[in-house]
A protein has these predicted regions:
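Generic detection of long, well-ordered alpha-helical segments
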Residues: 102-109, 122-126, 321-332, 336, ...
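Catalytic nucleotidyl-transfer cores of nucleotide-processing enzymes
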Residues: 278-367
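Extended, helix-rich architectural segments
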Residues: 1-279, 396-397, 415, 487, ...
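C-terminal anchoring/interaction modules
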Residues: 1-67, 136, 144, 150-157, ...
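Short intrinsically disordered coil segments
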Residues: 160-163, 192-198, 327, 369-371, ...
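Short, flexible segments with low predicted structural confidence
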Residues: 108, 115, 306, 373-375, ...
Length: 605
């Protein structure tokens, strides 16, 4: 390299845009501000996936044994299983509620619910929600956004374009890939920056195949020109800049000489000081922390970025929430400490320390071994204090406390608690054990899933083609139909509501109360029963048990079905009687010998 190149700086090569540099600085500042939080989450992850204590904080202890009891992991799996069961109790997880008569019409409601149910099933919505639930438990924070997918595959032999999935999709955002202002009034009002690492080929494909993304090709050429300059440079050619850091790469030179590119997507409002212009709800994409490759108004109709966040335990004046496992790490540390201390104590009992006094011949420690000692020689076994063997009791106490504090008691996992219980007590304990699950899942539904589903519907209205075919099951005839849905069919005033945890808890409580009432003397009192509508109770149970689609409840259906059964029984009895009846009388035939007719053979009638 020529001597004139030596001493160059990154800024002289990159020539960063002022706005891009400002966004990059905000990303670095917000990322540094959460390092303590990230260290705490890293410790939790080490305990969750540990196979022994050598990879956890317990490695600092002096114990010889390194057994790890995965209590934290077991609580995590239990919470995830219960959250998933509460969020998706049936195959119809959503319901459309219109804000006017037209939006609440049956055809409109059917089209919207069928379209969204079909897209949720095809796009793997439950799988993505499952991933977000793990973030909800592990990090205490879950993030997601809707995207519109139009997949196309090319047949390698014929060259034919085969259409794939077309429609909205929920996309999980890793809590480690998004930064925001943690002291903002709300997450919706905070600026957000999402970091991603793409290959140069994928970025070029987005520019060529997806013009709707509005990436600027001239900026991509500038990015490639920068990499061509770095291809022939080494560290001795210019001064190192500590300000440029890319996570996942050893240094900036390795990054620029690789096939990867860092992309930062900024969502929010910003004020341009040079021109005095205010930009509201803007989407700005920068690459290499230096160049703006996209700067457009956010295309959604909601007025804010379609990025949604939910926290497990919210903090005052801090948008980073706590998780259910945060307060349990210390107890997990204590459990592993007691387990390995107890194991070392057992080892000292089986292989005790020996104190040798005087002249003692060498011997091998084992059963039946003879030890020869001198006149004043002796071998004394140093027995440890056996109090440590009671550590199992303390471990059980800590495990029970961890389950209770995380809201995951043993009865919620199917383990029976000690003591005799009546049926009412069992039901009461079950409801109490599920209360914290239903509370958290109802909050998850209201704050996270509901706005996310409505945003998926909004992005479908903006991007879908002339029409789409959705699969619908006809409950009357038990056949599958395909409904043609247009953009107008899914355009209405109203909102989608998840009908999982909140409705499941309410319905289960009402059914339990009704069952207990009818089992009591009050419900069996004729004076009370005379004033209770049987039709209303039937319709209520049909709604609570989610049986409307089977049409089990109809006015006086039991009476008509009973009459129909009786008619069939009478018709069957009549047919049987006619079949078993004797033959009729035969007509008399006159003989040739007598002029009198012959007597009838059958009985007289």
């Amino acid at each position: 390299m020529a001597s004139g190149v030596r001493g160059m700086t990154l800024d002289s090569i990159l020539q960063p845009d002022a706005l891009a540099a400002k966004i990059a600085v905000n990303y670095d500042n917000w990322n540094m501000a959460r390092q303590v939080w990230m260290d705490q989450k890293r410790e939790i992850r080490n305990y969750l996936f540990a196979t022994d204590t050598t990879t956890t904080t317990n490695s600092q202890l002096p114990w010889k044994n390194s057994t790890h009891i995965p209590k934290l992991c077991q609580i995590r799996d239990n919470l995830h299983a219960n959250y998933t069961a509460a969020l998706f109790p049936n195959d119809r997880p959503i319901k459309w509620e219109g804000d006017d008569e037209t939006s609440e019409a049956l055809d409109k409601r059917t089209s919207i619910e069928a379209y969204m149910n079909n897209k949720m099933r095809q796009s793997g919505f439950r799988t993505e929600i499952s991933k977000c639930l793990y973030d909800f438990i592990d990090y205490g924070n879950a993030f997601a956004m809707p995207v519109f997918i139009a997949e196309k595959n090319v047949d390698g032999v014929t060259g034919e374009i085969i259409p794939g999935y077309v429609g909205p999709k929920m996309e999980r955002i890793s809590p480690l890939d998004i930064v925001f202002n943690p002291v903002a009034a709300s997450f919706a009002e905070s600026h957000k920056i999402i970091r991603s690492i793409k290959t140069l080929a994928s970025l070029k494909a987005d520019i060529d195949d997806h013009p709707e993304m509005k990436y600027m090709e001239d900026v991509f050429k500038k990015v490639m020109n920068t990499r061509h300059q770095f291809a022939s440079l080494n560290h001795s050619d210019f001064n190192k800049s500590n300000a440029f850091q890319v996570d996942g790469f050893t240094d900036y030179l390795t990054y620029f000489q690789s096939d990867y590119i860092e992309v930062l997507d900024f969502y929010g409002d910003y004020y341009e000081q040079e021109t005095g212009k205010f930009y509201k709800n803007q989407l700005i994409t920068i690459v290499d922390k230096s160049h703006i490759i996209r700067n457009i108004p956010n295309p959604n109709w909601l007025g804010t970025a379609s990025i949604f966040h939910v926290g497990w335990r919210t903090r005052p004046d801090n948008l980073y929430a706590m998780g259910p496992l945060d307060n349990l790490v210390g107890m997990q540390y204590r459990i592993d400490h007691l387990e390995n201390a107890k194991a070392d104590a057992f080892d000292l009992i089986v292989h005790p320390v020996m104190k040798i006094r005087g002249m003692v011949e060498d011997f091998d420690y084992g059963p039946g071994e003879r030890i020869f000692v001198g006149d004043e020689g002796d071998v004394i076994f140093m027995s440890p204090d056996t109090t440590m063997l009671a550590a199992d009791t303390q471990i059980q106490i800590y495990e029970a406390k961890m389950e209770e504090m995380a809201g995951a008691p043993k009865q919620a996992m199917g383990f029976r608690t000690p003591g005799e219980k009546t049926a009412f007590e069992v039901q009461t304990l079950e409801n109490s054990a599920n209360r914290i699950f239903l509370n958290k899942t109802a909050y998850f539904e209201e704050v996270f899933m509901e706005p996310l589903l409505n945003s998926m519907l909004e992005i479908s209205r903006r991007n879908m083609g002339p029409s789409d075919l959705v699969r619908v099951l006809d409950n009357d005839f038990a056949v599958v139909n395909f409904l043609k849905v247009t953009r107008e069919d899914i355009t209405a005033r109203g909102k989608l509501r998840p009908i999982g945890a909140r409705h499941f808890a309410r319905n289960a409580n009402i059914v339990q109360n009704l069952t207990q009432m009818y089992s009591s003397s009050l419900g069996q009192d004729p004076a009370v029963a005379a004033h209770v509508s049987g039709k209303a109770i039937a319709h209520l149970m049909e709604e609570l048990l989610d049986l409307e689609r089977f049409q089990l409840v109809q006015d006086n259906i039991r009476v008509s079905e009973t009459l129909e059964t009786q008619q069939l029984a009478q018709a069957g009895s009549q047919m049987l009687a006619e079949r078993n009846a004797p033959a009729g009388p035969e007509m008399a035939v006159p003989t040739a010998n007598s002029g009198t007719p012959a007597a009838p053979k059958g009985p007289a009638r």
